[in-house]
Amino acid sequence: YDLVGSEMCIRDRLMLVKSEDDGKTWSQPINITPQVKDPSWYFLLQGPGRGITMKDGTLVFPIQFIDSTRIPNAGIMYSKDRGTTWHLHNLARTNTTEAQVAEIEPGVLMLNMRDNRGGSRAVATTRDLGKTWYEHPSSRSALQEPVCMASLIHVDAKDNITGKDLLIFSNPNTTKGRNHITIKVSTDGGMTWPLSNQVTLDEDESWGYSCLSMIDKETVGIFYESSVAHMTFQAVKLTDLVK
């Protein structure tokens, strides 16, 4: 933080580290702030959560920034050269923050966003890496939230036991308080999330953040802030989620 006049200003740095041996060793931090941050912005950071590699090899991270009007906005940044250079285009929706990105079709990205308006998740899609965004039909209606981070992953039909393309989502399944941590599955591209495809993991209060990852074709893993520990890991069979 720097004191400028009578204001405390954030001098943030967006840093990247990389591993080329499956995480055994890591590079020194690489400052990519000048590549992606508009000088007029107050703040820029990633997700939180996970990034993805698109089918064409493009690396994508969800981001959030506070612009010159002091309004937060969610979007994405991407690299087409294995992380050497990074690009950021336009915000997906204003007054949004923590987001997760998934490639729902080749070249089509879905951004699922924490929305400061409260009540439900904002969802948008892009076909040009964030130059233009389109509101998804499920936005602000299909997935309730208490204004909290959430996790979203896409799993191709060939990569899971159900033989269906899946969107898997986790968050506190409520509009009040951070409780009822739930995993949900959509088999129609995020249009609907049937009750039969939902499993509640923790009904009590917690911080509510989570991160999903496939373990194998039959199992999804979730790392989340639970009511019984700072961080909890569980493995859930897809056959318990997809009916």
Segments from the language model and where they lie:
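Asp-box/BNR beta-propeller loop motif
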Residues: 17-33, 77-88, 124-135, 140, ...
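Single conserved hydrophobic/aromatic residue that forms the stacking wall/gate
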Residues: 1-5, 10
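Entry beta-strands of beta-propeller and related beta-repeat scaffolds
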Residues: 57-62, 107-110, 160-169, 218-222
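Structural motif
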Residues: 11-15, 69-75, 118-124, 177-183, ...
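Beta-propeller and closely related beta-sheet repeat lectin domains
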Residues: 47-50, 97-100, 148-151, 208-211
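Loop/turn-rich, solvent-exposed surfaces of beta-rich toroidal or solenoidal domains
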Residues: 121, 141-194
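Conserved blade-ending motifs and adjacent loop-strand segments that build the rim/top face
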Residues: 140-149, 191-216
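Blade-level signature of beta-propeller repeat domains, shared across WD40, Kelch, NHL, RCC1
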Residues: 209-243
